[in-house]
Amino acid sequence: MSNGTNIDVAGAINTLTETFGKLFQMQVDVANNSLKALAEVAEPLGKTATDLVASFANVATQVLQNVSSAVAPKK
């Protein structure tokens, strides 16, 4: 009969299920935190890139105006 080593199969399955659930939740949390961090980094980079493009456009416009006024015949 029994020698005192009963295996609690249901308990082991419950423990494994709980462990896998926690691992999955941790992966979801890591992915969520990574996305938040990327968004926090991308926002200032996007603003900086937009400002840089606007500055470049302003410089290009000023250069074209100066070239046009230098080339235009004087009255």
From Swiss-Prot:
Q: Where in the cell is it found?
A: Chlorosome, Chlorosome envelope
Keyword tags = Bacteriochlorophyll, Chlorophyll, Chlorosome, Chromophore, Photosynthesis, Repeat
Q: Where is this region: 4 X approximate repeats?
A: 8-61
Q: Which GO terms describe its molecular function?
A: bacteriochlorophyll binding
GO biological process annotations for this chain's record?
Answer: photosynthesis
Start-end of the sequence repeats? 8-17, 29-39, 40-50, 51-61
Gene Ontology CC: one annotated term: chlorosome envelope
Q: Identify its protein family.
A: Belongs to the CsmB/CsmF family.
**Listed name of the protein:** Chlorosome envelope protein B
Instruction: Write down the species.
Output: Prosthecochloris vibrioformis (Chlorobium vibrioforme)
The gene name on file is csmB
